[in-house]
C-alpha cells in the first residue's frame, strides 16, 4: 500500500470512529492492535458487539502531544506506546497533516495532567476487525456509519414533523 493511501485509510477509519474511545492496546511498532469502543456502530454488525479492533502495521511514527491541564504545566510529548495509551482517548476527528494523520482526542480521567491532545500516526497499513476478528474494509465500515447517521437524521426529521403537526 502506498503511503498516501495508508494515510487516507487511517484518516477515514478514525473519522468514522468519531466519539469512539481507544480503550486498550497490545503490540509494538511492527504490529499494534487497538481496541476501539464504538458501540453505536459495532451493534449494527451484531447487537452484542461494542467494539472494533484496529491494527497498524509497520508504524513509522507514533506520538501524542497532550493538552496540559492546567495549561501552565510544562509541555510534554509521548513517544512510547505505553505512555501514549495510558489513558482512554476519545476520538474527535482525524485529518491528514504533512506525512501524518492527526487524530484529535479528548481525555477525561482527572488522574492525568492532560485533558486530551493530538495523536500523530504514520504506518504502512491499517486494518479494521469486528469483535469476532472478521476484517472489515473501509467501504464496509463507511456504509455501516452512513446507514447509522441516515437513520438518526430520519428520526430527527420525523420528530420535527410530528412536533410541527401538534
Label each PLM-derived region with a short phrase.
Residues 1-166:
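Surface-exposed, interaction-prone regions used to assemble/regulate multi-protein complexes
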